[in-house]
Amino acid sequence: MSGESLPWISGDLEIEKSVMDEIEQHALEGYPSESCGFVFGPADQPALLDALQREANEADKYHRLDPVTFPRTSNTYFKINELRAARTFEQGQNDGRPVKVIYHSHCDAGAYFSDEDSATFANEGQLMWPCAYIVVSVMNGEVAERRLWVHEPGTNGFRESTLTIREP
């Protein structure tokens, strides 16, 4: 999977203000749990993010079922249903409106890409899902910051990239 065939995975994206506002609202509504979801855009405008789909954070469900394997709760971890994610990516590609970003929030922590995030979304230098990542920080019930993260090819690391808010 390369940035040439899927340019949004390389970053430098532009998000419509209404979409960023909705991501932030989702983060505030979910607090003190992490929120998560997908952001889409037209395939023929690779940098544009113009729609989102909220997803349920299933971290607490997994933690209740198997706290040894899933020791973290939704306050510090998010888990999207993998089958639903695969179907969403496939449908987006088929519709010409691919998933370009997975977003999630951090509660009372910065908008960094955590070691857990890196381990979840990259393995042996390969990106697990063909997208970039937005992390929104909610501190004491208020949005503090937001950052876009992209995979460093050939590593399990991620770097910050430019995310521009597109005013109406």
Model regions: which residues?
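Conserved beta-strand-loop surface patch within small alpha/beta domains used
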Residues: 1-99, 108-168
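Residue-level "edge-of-site" marker
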Residues: 105
